[in-house]
Amino acid sequence: MSYTELESGYQDISQQHQQQNPHQSQPQQRVGFYLGLQDGNGDTDFGDSNDGMDSDTSTSSSNSKQVVVGICAMAKKTQSKPMKEILTRLGEFEFIKLVTFEENVILREPVQNWPTCDCLVSFHSKGFPLEKAIEYAQLRNPFVLNNLHMQYDIQDRRRVYAILEKEGIEIPRYAVLDRDSPDPKHHELIESEDHVEVNGITFNKPFVEKPVSAEDHNIYIYYPTSAGGGSQRLFRKIGSRSSVYSPESRVRKTGSFIYEDFMPTDGTDVKVYTVGPDYAHAEARKSPALDGKVERDSEGKEIRYPVILNHSEKLISRKVCLAFKQTVCGFDLLRANGKSYVCDVNGFSFVKNSNKYYDDCAKILGNMILRELTPTLHIPWSVPFQLDDPPIVPTTFGKMMELRCVVAVIRHGDRTPKQKMKVEVRHPKFFEIFEKYDGYKLGHVKLKRPKQLQEILDIARFLLSEIHTKAHAEIEEKESKLEQLKNVLEMYGHFSGINRKVQMKYQPKGRPRGSSSDDTNLAADQPVEPSLVLILKWGGELTPAGRIQAEELGRIFRCMYPGGQGRSDYSGTQGLGLLRLHSTFRHDLKIYASDEGRVQMTAAAFAKGLLALEGELTPILVQMVKSANTNGLLDNDCDSSKYQNLAKGRLHELMQNDREFSKEDRELINPCNSKSITQALDFVKNPVDCCHHVHLLIRELLHIISIKKDDPKTKDAILYHGETWDLMRCRWEKIEKDFSTKSKLFDISKIPDIYDCIKYDLQHNQHTLQYDQAEELYIYAKNLADIVIPQEYGLTPQEKLAIGQGICSPLLRKIKGDLQRNIDEVEDEFMNRLNPHYSHGVASPQRHVRTRLYFTSESHVHSLLTVLRYGGLLNVVTDEQWRRAMDYISMVSELNYMSQIVIMLYEDPTKDPTSEERFHVELHFSPGVNCCVQKNLPPGPGFRPHSHGDNACNVSLQSSDESNPARIEEENDSNSGEEREGKKRGTSGQRSTDRSAERISPAFGFNRLELRSKQFKSKPIPIGAHHTVSGHEAMDLAKRLNEELASHQQQQNQQLRPISPDIRAVTPDCEPRSRSFEQRPTSGVCAKEPDSQVSVSVSASVSSANASTSSRRQRHSIAGQMSYMKMLGFGGFSKKMATSANSLFSTAVISGSSSAPNLRDMITVSSSGFGDVPPIRPLETLHNALSLRKLDSFLQDMILAQIFKTPTGSPPRGFSKNTLPAVSSMTLTASNQTEVVEHEPISTTVTPTFDRRGSESGSTADAHLRLLSESQCPNLDDSNTELRESLAGKMELWPQDIVKAAEDEELNLSELETKPSLDLTMEIMERGVAGIASIQPMNRDSDETMGGGVFLSVCEEQGSGSTCLTPVSFGMDLDLSMVANKGSITLSMEGFDDDEDATLSAATTPSLLADCEPRLESCYCCPSHAEAPPEVPSDDPRFGFALPVRVTQASPEHARPVRRAHDPVSPRIQKQISLFEGNAAMATGQEKTESSGSVGGGAILHASINLPAAGPHHLRQDARLRKFENLTQSTSNSNFPFESNTLKRVPMQTTKDYDNVSHTQSCINLKSGSSGVLGGSPQRQRGSDGGGVGASGVPAESREPTRVHYGRMNSTCCSASASPSPSPGALIVKERFIEPPKRGVVRGYHGKTQSMDADFLFNEFLLLPAMAPAKISFDSSDIDQASDDDSPSSSKQRHA
């Protein structure tokens, strides 16, 4: 029987009784105090007492004996409101009579004169004579509610902790410093800068210092220097303060204290109030340690929030109540690290301001007293039914979706310019410091702590004094730098540990020289001694403006949570829902920040705004912000910096050409065709001229600074953030020197610094500086920076993706986990949140919202954006929302301060839990703060200034171009009331004014009516609508939007694009309807400005049977540019959609509305908001119809993806032959038009084999056939159905592994975008089964076969020799050990189990070695790239080609010669292996074999791989060897992977046993005439060697006719040096390739389909022989090129 049923029965009996005795029950109107009464809904209601039901005792005579309850406490307590409330309710019990002892009596009268009572409620407070109360209890022997003797213990924190420990209750680690003890061992204290040692126990800061007396509330918390130092001093509340921050960092020297670890509690404390062992009321309040500001409600009471305790906490509450023998007892809980700790026991105390608690408490106490005393006093009282706990009443969900998770990645706020100075030092004092901090172990030291910086400062002062007293040449040379070192270290008067750092690096042979500002007085021939390079870094601190931005953004963020716009329950502020959520533990908030001070302070300021905190940032930082560098989450020291440097090198070389950018230059600099970069290139024209102009402007600026510095009127002027004229001059002088190098070239890497500095000075110092050309310098620097900064993260999409994945893989993994945990959570564990009785305005009290905020620097924002943009999340062709989003991102020129990417996960509990519509994901992005200056716009079509949304901000554009009028305010579309509503705009500076006032200004220079008539309305896609937009709905939405756009395209073709204001209103009443792309001349603009958003898609492998669903799931890759959330407001949908996200986001971009920001013009706005704090642009919704499954699989692919490749997912193994899965291919962006053009065919070789997985091969063949027939030619019309049928007929001939390689290498094909004219067709040649050879796998009995190859070659129109572009390739350093190698592993990782805790550490991706520096060339011909570029709709003429496919029969003699596993190892491999083992001796003596035809002693691998001695053939498997070694190395997590018994050689049959497998690991392109990678001399490579097997594995007699053609198909691709002009498609850069970042093996979470054992690895990577064509069909045109084609035609082989 349930409690409810019992209660119901009990009530029925009582009511019948009342009806029988109406005369008795009528006069008694008192409330009955019983637990578990029922409300009208049939739910058990703990708190409803006024239900008209009387106490059972109503039948008794009112004259019978009563229980006398004596209240013995100080008057201040007995007269307090909570006590009065409870006593009033207790007095309503018929059998209870209350007697309150007067304070005078208690203090002055002997206990004999005190009133007598049956039950004593007595408790200690300041001034209370506890000993008299004990004496009274012994005299009268009443029933004592709270044990009096134990109240002595409660007054001593040492005893409290001892009792808690004895009961097994968790408490913080602590130690007692007892200065009163005679034993010196009890008061040993050693204090250091960042820790104290108490009686031998060390406490690192932050720690807590508590007086041993519980009556002393002066508790101090000490902070570490890394967070700014100082301490927070807590005290009993005085007014609205409960603590204050103090800069004092030293502990107190008098008195006895308890020292304990500080527990990070996310800023809230839980206060628990027991009433007996079975009842506990808990509430949360803001921790006094956070900011010391007491939150009070409108009545001035401290705001507290009810909390539901979890099971373990209820047990703690019971234990505390019983251990201290206090029926009524309060104690403090800290929830930290997943546990609950008791940190204080307060004894008798009541909850304030909770009527519900007063009811409960009086009921429980009354019943407890009566139950105890009525039997002895013979009172006829029957015990009512009781419930231990109030039941949980879940609220109904309704139609709104429930927000479950918010993940945001946010860049830090406005900062001072970062500055750096290097100086070479040799003084012994520096070496002493270096040694002291273990510099010789690592080769470098980082000094950040105040004490360390003080030591460096002391040395600098000492050396400077030495210089002045006695000249010393070595020191003198550095005087200016030492002076600067001293000035910087003395700058703020104190060291806080977050704004300066010194690094020292050991240079055994002195320091290599760099730019002109380096100290370079040493002669070149001077003998060099070891030295230290001292690098001083300062600046880069968060400015006050940055703090305001972050705080305001935090405040805005509140509004996206449930109840954010609802009624104001407590403080009347916006975003209240979040504050309640947080304080009631329904908000699971974690804030991570990388370790830079500016990032941490941004995070703290954001938390301050988000949670409405006050006070200093240091305490908030310590409690709320977790450092993400402990787990490498936001670490910047990742390997991809090496590859970034190589990309930078290529970019910088391209920017050194002293000529206007040619078409080729543009294609090389901006292969992704980003609109913002195109725009900047148009402005810059000649990069050298532009740099020269910038240099001149900087010199002028320096001249002005020197004048102002000496001018008596201005020399004392205070610059922003306390900077002096001297410091400003030093800053600009260093930039000026560094920018212009000794060779008279410009150092392009300084452009970001120049832009940084001028942006800072223009925003903060222009009023003092008054430099007339500041804006001009800003504009030039910005345009240069718009090219340099984004392209330093890679030029091509593949480079960008590779570098991006290298930087943000750990973060992606964490985000994936954040989203996943919401689905998997166990309900029981989360029952510790909001009491449902208080859940007004919150969707469901038992659930919680997970918020994860990651604050980081620009690199992570860029990387995450790149991964979203190019990783293949959605398809720009089929997904209209995504196309618009990508367009928008392409226009974003800069990821400014406070840029954000936000992912929001919603759940619809009404949907089936397994349905894809259950969880719904939205993706938002903001480019951060606005630029700080209005600037001229380059003339040209499509540019139109936009409004700031505020008439007062109207600024005229200084533009001579008539089509560039002054700023045009937002159009007022008077046709629609809804639209008028949507035009409300506000700025941050106007938050206090009426934001809903419309600000419409007249048009300037435009016929507004004409514009309006051309406008059309598209319904915005509402965010947070009443149902999930997913499945077919998303497709319909996109289709509808498309049709609307299409219907208006023609008339808008010539029209200029309007731009929305960057500001949107914050108020929930203002829902601006934004219409960004409505007036966009979609087809026209696209045609003029092709933007190849090349997104390399991850194939979703879903059944094509459900066409619409599958196409939806395969939408293309995310362009997620991180941007600032506009602090000021956001817009986007009608009021009937009002949900938690209401008015927070703009859906302008995806809904195709006219107010979407058009960032192409890079317009900046005048400062608005807080003085000179520019406002933040709104979060634009990139997509609001994503399914969680889609996003999850995308993140999984990105985490597992091999660098440089798009992670193409493979089709699921084992579906039947008649289901052909649709596999999405790489899609080059964009438009709805496709040209299909016939061209001459190119030849393709397909070698079918049996798949070694047996029966699976047929089904996967279907998939791959479809891959080649459909994804490569998606737009072939019906005339090509014959082709498809003929392909279908051959599907059995397609081996899984071949096309797997094709899928894996898909990404390289995207490079086709680099040249407009490519003739591509495909000819598929079959082979008979006769040509199939087999492989003997290790430890297998059966012969299973594997092999085959798919090749493409490209025939260019000019016939200038083939080209090969490996977009991001491998570093060729011979001295790089394998451990350090980062190549690209091509194993598809889908089959491995996911290990959530796996770390991305082990190197799995080796580099390939070469004898020479390769050129970067363009390759569509390598076997591994076994696919032609896909046919996609595109408005870019470069992609307007068709790909006819011709199937021809190949004869069996095309079988290729085979390489056996026991063939000799090439010397290159040998060298690599010996390097890996650190055994240099092994490498010697191998070199000579390269010039002969065979390898002699190169067969040694590692002792544990038992390969036979040299044979007649070359083992061309180094790629797989290294891949295999590194893979096993990473899977075993050991330095060297092999156990000698793991891999045993099985004797092989003959060479004919294998088929050659020809898949390049990467196209390594070698210079002409150099020795081949795979062990052949140049002569042999050119075919001059008479016998044996050539480098390509072709018999000598057949080599000559085939080499030319195959050179393009299989080789390292004829280099550009062989022909005078680069071939179309070639990207020729002389730098070496970019190495990919190190990747670890991460296991997939799908079913385990392949065991990752040694056999599998060995077979998969090591024993698959390389393959080359014996005879290949070729055109006569190929032979013509034979004489030109002089480069080696061997390619590193690998099996995908």
Curated annotation (Swiss-Prot):
Annotated residues that bind substrate are located at 76-77, 236-237, 271, 285, 349-352
The UniProt record gives the binding positions of ATP as 157, 210, 217, 236, 260-263, 269-271, 287, 332, 344-346
EC number(s) on file = 2.7.4.24
GO molecular function annotations of the record: 5-diphosphoinositol pentakisphosphate 1-kinase activity; ATP binding; inositol hexakisphosphate 1-kinase activity; inositol hexakisphosphate 5-kinase activity; inositol hexakisphosphate kinase activity; inositol-1,3,4,5,6-pentakisphosphate kinase activity
Polar residues composition-biased segments: 953-963
Q: Which reaction does it catalyse?
A: 1D-myo-inositol hexakisphosphate + ATP = 1-diphospho-1D-myo-inositol 2,3,4,5,6-pentakisphosphate + ADP; 5-diphospho-1D-myo-inositol 1,2,3,4,6-pentakisphosphate + ATP + H(+) = 1,5-bis(diphospho)-1D-myo-inositol 2,3,4,6-tetrakisphosphate + ADP
Acidic residues compositional bias, start-end: 45-54, 1677-1687
User: What GO cellular component entries does it have?
Assistant: cytosol
Q: Where is this region: Polyphosphoinositide-binding domain?
A: 394-465
Q: What is known of its domains?
A: The N-terminal kinase domain produces inositol polyphosphates. The C-terminal acid phosphatase-like domain binds inositol polyphosphates and negatively regulates their accumulation. The C-terminal domain reduces the amount of inositol pyrophosphates in a dose-dependent manner in vitro.
The family note in this entry says: Belongs to the histidine acid phosphatase family. VIP1 subfamily.
**Job description of the protein:** Bifunctional inositol kinase that acts in concert with the IP6K kinases to synthesize the diphosphate group-containing inositol pyrophosphates diphosphoinositol pentakisphosphate, PP-InsP5, and bis-diphosphoinositol tetrakisphosphate, (PP)2-InsP4. PP-InsP5 and (PP)2-InsP4, also respectively called InsP7 and InsP8, may regulate a variety of cellular processes, including apoptosis, vesicle trafficking, cytoskeletal dynamics, and exocytosis. Phosphorylates inositol hexakisphosphate (InsP6) at position 1 to produce PP-InsP5 which is in turn phosphorylated by IP6Ks to produce (PP)2-InsP4.
Protein name per its UniProtKB record: Inositol hexakisphosphate and diphosphoinositol-pentakisphosphate kinase
Protein source organism: Drosophila melanogaster
